[in-house]
């Protein structure tokens, strides 16, 4: 649906008096005409004063015809995704990681027992970085699809320390 007025009318009809949030559509960078986003895991060890670290990341490529990556066709390492999309290099990943760490730090100040957040990060066609959402219990299964198991081992280690 492209008509914003019709979308709002439909939401009002379906939700009646309940509130709702409409998320802005991002023109995500693409690989082979399929949008992708990045999952970045930020964790810290036990103890409120522990520093946040990025312990893993991967890219989720949407299935053909989908605008969102919830239905991913494949999971690949982020450097490979950036290369295939021809939008940047490791410095773009470093920027996304810094943003995820800043967000995790702020969330940790508000929720002192929080030790893990999985951020879905979008990169648009102009290399702007967007936090799509953060998950306190991110799905770690996609890390098993990567050839290198070191990130998953690191994530699991942080969960137990």
Which residues make up each language-model segment?
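C-terminal active-site "lid" helix and adjoining low-complexity regulatory extension at the edge
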Residues: 91-94, 98, 105, 110-114, ...
């Amino acid at each position: 649906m492209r008509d914003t007025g019709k979308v709002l009318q439909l939401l009002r009809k379906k939700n009646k008096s309940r509130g709702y949030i409409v998320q802005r559509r991002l023109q995500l960078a693409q690989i082979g005409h399929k949008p992708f986003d990045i999952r970045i895991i930020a964790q810290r060890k036990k103890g409120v004063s522990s520093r946040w670290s990025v312990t893993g990341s991967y890219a989720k490529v949407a299935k053909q015809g989908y605008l969102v990556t919830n239905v991913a066709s494949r999971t690949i390492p982020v450097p490979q995704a950036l290369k295939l999309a021809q939008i940047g290099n490791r410095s773009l990943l470093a920027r996304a990681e810094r943003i995820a760490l800043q967000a995790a730090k702020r969330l940790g100040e508000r929720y002192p027992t929080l030790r893990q957040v999985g951020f879905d990060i979008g990169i648009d066609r102009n290399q702007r970085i967007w936090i799509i959402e953060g998950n306190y219990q991110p799905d770690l299964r996609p890390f098993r699809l990567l050839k290198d198991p070191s990130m998953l081992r690191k994530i699991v280690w942080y969960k137990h320390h």
